[in-house]
Amino acid sequence: MKLERVTVKNFRSHSDTVVEFKEGINLIIGQNGSGKSSLLDAILVGLYWPLRIKDIKKDEFTKVGARDTYIDLIFEKDGTKYRITRRFLKGYSSGEIHAMKRLVGNEWKHVTEPSSKAISAFMEKLIPYNIFLNAIYIRQGQIDAILESDEAREKVVREVLNLDKFETAYKKLSELKKTINNRIKEYRDILARTENIEELIKENEQELIQVLQEISKIEEVLPSKRSKVDMLRKEVLRLEETKVEIENSERLLEKRRGDKRTLEERIKNTEEYLEKLKEKEKELEEQVKEITSIKKDVDAYLALKEFKNEYLDKKYKIEKELTRVEELINEIQKRIEELNEKESEKEKLENEKKEILNKLAILEKDHQLYEEIKAKKENLRQLKEKLGDKSPEDIKKLLEELETKKTTIEEERNEITQRIGELKNKIGDLKTAIEELKKAKGKCPVCGRELTDEHREELLSKYHLDLNNSKNTLAKLIDRKSELERELRRIDMEIKRLTPLLTVAEQIRSIEEELNVVNLEKIEKNATEYEKLLEELRTLEGRIRGLAEDLKKLAPLEKKLAALIHKKQELEKELKELNTKLESFGFKSVEDLDSKLRELEEIYKRYLTLLNSKKELEITQREIAKAKETLEMSFEELAEVEADIERIEKKLSQLKQKYNEEEYKKKREEKEELEKELARLEAQKKELEKRRDTIKSTLEKLKAEKENRERVKKEIKDLEKAKDFTEELIEKVKKYKALAREAALSKIGELASEIFAEFTEGKYSEVVVRAEENKVRLFVVWEGKERPLTFLSGGERIALGLAFRLAMSLYLAGEISLLILDEPTPYLDEERRRKLITIMERYLKKIPQVILVSHDEELKDAADHVIRISLENGSSKVEVVS
């Protein structure tokens, strides 16, 4: 695999970065925090998202303030170019882009469906994730793990050399062996449970024969029993039906005899009731004849009473309306007189209004000028309140003093800021010197002479004293800087407050000059007179508007008065006509009419009484007809009932001849005994059939178990063969894992020896790698003897860790064409960093493409291509150096 180009947008500090990689050693150089390692993380995300690395999360790698992240990679594998494009949306999964294509001719074509899952599956086949992460990509911290412990070193070796596949195979084969043993045990348990299967089959077959014989015996006697029971059931049913029919006929006969008695009683009562109705009819006919003789007087009474009611009602309404109309006429006449007086008043007020308007026109100019002066005086008052007790000269002087003080404070703050930066650098240098001095062995890194414990302690004491003094001074300077910045903020606020007051002072001076040139007393007097006249004008106009509104009502009132006078004349005419109609009936007054009505009223009351008799006669005649009809129907029903009684008595006599109670009881008892016997036999047969089916089912299961027993015996033989084969494989995997690890570690030891010898200028002749159970132990050979890692100085330990890790990658160089190293020199001293350049030129150039990330400028000499990354305004910038 070889990387060609990486495009990254909005990934951590990378806003828009494009990097092209070439064959040979590609050095990415830059200060810590510039975005070098972030570029490698972007490559990892582009190739293998979603990752199994905990510290790379989508919502965290998107650049602050950006909504999405874009990564585009072009790489070559086995002569084919591939391109992966990904776009991530912060906080969302929908809308993301994941695409992988290969170059066919001059056209990019998809190799998978455009999804993260499909690309991951394809990449796992093309370049497995573990191979890339362990063999190709040497991350920060892996060298520390090599030096941490024998167990941690074994884990790194296992991951890089992909020895986990042997461990996985060993575990899976062990699990398979356990499964086979469990299966064999299960099958042997089955054989033990079914050992007496033949005896059980024989016993069930004999029991089945016995049950079938018993069923056959019952089936022989059942038909005759069923036939006899059916015959008895029919005979008993016939006798029961006859008995029921006799009982029904007796009940019906008794009912019809009761019906006969009821009808005879009804006929007697109806005849008596009819006689009474005929007597009542005769009396009512006499009363009806009297109605005809008094009918004329009744009609006269009703006509006069109706006229009286109509006369009184109309007279009351006319007189009431006439009174209302006369009252309205008087009221409107008074209102018209009042409106005529208001017309004169309105003309007088109009003349007064004209005089006031003339006076207002003369005073208007002074009034306007007075309003302007009032506004200026109010403005002057407000401005003076803002200014307080200070003069414009005082404010100007204060501002000049504040500006001078601000300049002095800013100069002091800038000097302190510079001193703080110098002290921070000094503190950093002192900490580095202390750490290097603690780790240093042999020569003193300060003076170059031999480093004794006494000399080390003397230097450390001096450095710590200087460090504490610098920290104390730094703390005081930071406090003083904070104090100065607070004072600057206060001064800025005071300047901001005072500056507008200069403008206020100028406005006050201008307004006072304008007010001094006018005759304020005269203008104020005229303005007061203007306001007084204006108020009088408003009052007059209100009164005039009120009078005008009232005068609008005059014409409608005059029209309404004429209409009311006409209506009064009409009502008087109607009243006269009503009295004329009373006289036409022969009465001079209402009293005469009342006298005549009292005379006719007694006749009318008698008429009403007789009128009820006529209605009652009609009702009585209808009741007589109805009684006659009822009597006739009752005689007909009586004849029918007597005929029914005769027929039922005859039928009952015939039924009693067919039925014998003793015979019925005897046959019923015989039937019940036979039914019990039949039920017992059928239940016995059903139970035997159920037992038969159970035995058959048991036999089928036993025979199936017998067949299964033979199959299980064969399965056990096959499983025992598989178990033997699995045990052989487990031993082979175990041996091959040990051989593969030993062979790899032997070669890695040789390569590590060469590289470490370069680092130490031949001080150590060999690196010994020894594999143990879950451990990889490292030794160095010095003066012909193996020495543990504790024998090495701090710098030598770091060099050994780097040499060992490079050796593992070089061991895999025949299989890989790309190596990525992230910060391989963080703890190397200057001499060993120079040695690393020689190692890179000798060993790393064997790999077709190397990408090396470092902040160490010295490595440029060994690189074929140099790319510099720097941080500007929070974004990473890329520059191709060579």
From Swiss-Prot:
Residues reported to bind ATP: 12, 32-38, 60-64, 140, 763-764, 791-796
Zinc-hook domain segment(s): 399-496
Effect of R797G: Decreases ATP-induced dimerization. Increases DNA end tethering
Effect in UniProt of substituting R805E: Increases ATP-induced dimerization. Increases DNA end tethering. Fails to promote HerA/NurA activity
InterPro entries reported for this sequence: ATPase_AAA_core, P-loop_NTPase, Rad50/SbcC_AAA, Rad50_ATPase_archaeal, Zn_hook_RAD50
UniProt-listed Pfam families: AAA_21, AAA_23, Rad50_zn_hook
SUPFAM superfamilies, per the entry: P-loop containing nucleoside triphosphate hydrolases, Rad50 coiled-coil Zn hook
Annotated residues for binding of Zn(2+): C444, C447
Name of the molecule in the record: DNA double-strand break repair Rad50 ATPase
Name of encoding gene: rad50
